[in-house]
């Protein structure tokens, strides 16, 4: 990431001349911190800060996540000794360490305070700091819809540029020049965009999933303060497409299994055999309990030896003479 063209350039040793003055200025620069953030006292419900040391603003690390009534230092390591947070104004004081160069981003939300995302790109923090402020607006649209982006405006807008950034690669959408009153729309966006130079609004028609990314608006080539839009295009669900195009399908009949005649006869015979044999085995096993022998009563008549009367059935009174 290269600093903007209009960023201040540090003085060289030849221009400083006096070594004592050079040493003094170096010590002062090392002890001077910078302050970034909203600088506005509001009631906020959440404050998040992230940092990326990459020039492409990738590989973000969370610096702090603050929620009321959280107390103490909300800054996470390894940033506890490098920054300090003012939660009332959402202001971050960044100390002049070489590791604090890069991209800083804050997102906050609160009462009468819609979600706000601001990015700060810091260069040369140990010498002559240069800060680029980028206001970020997040937008979500459905595939096929049109959406309008409202860029920054100023009293005199001589040059307006709109870019699309996908995977850190910028691509021009259009360029407007007031001096010739002409708008140049690049080939891939011709017929898809409508531009209003007076209000600096850009309307993109028929959003596609490939349109998801970052849109950047720059006025008068001012790279210190720009406005970015993070657009996410939600694709149409495939289930809805299938329901609209495919007619209702009929229920699939369950196939019937045809039985073989030989196998059926075999199973029937086996079942009859089992039903016949099992009761016979049960009856044979429990024959002593199922067939109780009749009681036998033996009587001896005095005076008539060797005569015994057996009564197999009937009551005992049959023995009376």
UniProtKB/Swiss-Prot annotation:
Q: Which InterPro entries match?
A: Ig-like_dom_sf, Ig-like_fold
Q: Which domain of life is it from?
A: Viruses
Q: Which SUPFAM superfamilies match?
A: Immunoglobulin
Name assigned to this protein: Uncharacterized protein ORF9
Source organism per UniProt: Fowl adenovirus A serotype 1 (strain CELO / Phelps) (FAdV-1)
Its ancestry begins with: Viruses, Varidnaviria, Bamfordvirae, Preplasmiviricota, Tectiliviricetes
């Amino acid at each position: 990431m290269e600093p903007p063209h209009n960023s201040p350039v540090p003085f060289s040793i030849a221009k400083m001349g006096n070594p004592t003055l050079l040493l003094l200025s170096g010590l002062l620069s090392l002890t001077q911190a910078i302050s970034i953030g909203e600088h506005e006292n509001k009631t906020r419900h959440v404050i998040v800060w992230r940092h990326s040391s990459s020039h492409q603003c990738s590989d973000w690390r969370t610096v702090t996540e603050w929620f009321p009534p959280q107390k103490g230092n909300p800054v996470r390591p390894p940033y506890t000794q490098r920054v300090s947070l003012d939660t009332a104004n959402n202001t971050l004081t960044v100390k002049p360490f070489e590791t604090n160069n890069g991209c800083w981003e804050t997102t906050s939300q609160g009462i009468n305070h819609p979600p706000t995302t601001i990015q700060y790109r810091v260069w040369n923090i140990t010498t002559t700091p240069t800060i680029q402020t980028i206001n970020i607006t997040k937008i979500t649209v459905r595939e096929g819809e049109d959406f309008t982006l409202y860029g920054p405006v100023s009293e005199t807008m001589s040059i307006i540029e709109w870019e699309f950034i996908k995977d850190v690669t910028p691509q021009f959408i259009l360029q407007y020049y007031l001096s010739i009153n002409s708008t140049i729309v690049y080939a891939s966006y011709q017929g898809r965009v409508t531009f209003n130079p007076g209000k600096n609004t850009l309307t993109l028609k028929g959003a596609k999933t490939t349109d998801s990314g970052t849109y950047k608006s720059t006025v008068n080539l001012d790279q210190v303060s720009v406005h970015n839009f993070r657009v996410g295009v939600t694709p149409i669900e495939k289930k809805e497409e299938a329901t609209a195009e495919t007619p209702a399908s009929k229920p699939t009949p369950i196939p019937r299994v045809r039985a073989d005649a030989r196998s059926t006869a075999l199973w029937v015979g086996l079942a009859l055999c089992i039903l016949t044999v099992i009761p016979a085995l049960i009856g044979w096993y429990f024959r002593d309990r199922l067939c109780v022998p009749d009681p036998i009563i033996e009587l001896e008549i005095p005076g008539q030896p060797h005569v015994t009367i057996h009564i197999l059935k009937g009551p005992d009174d049959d023995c009376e003479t």
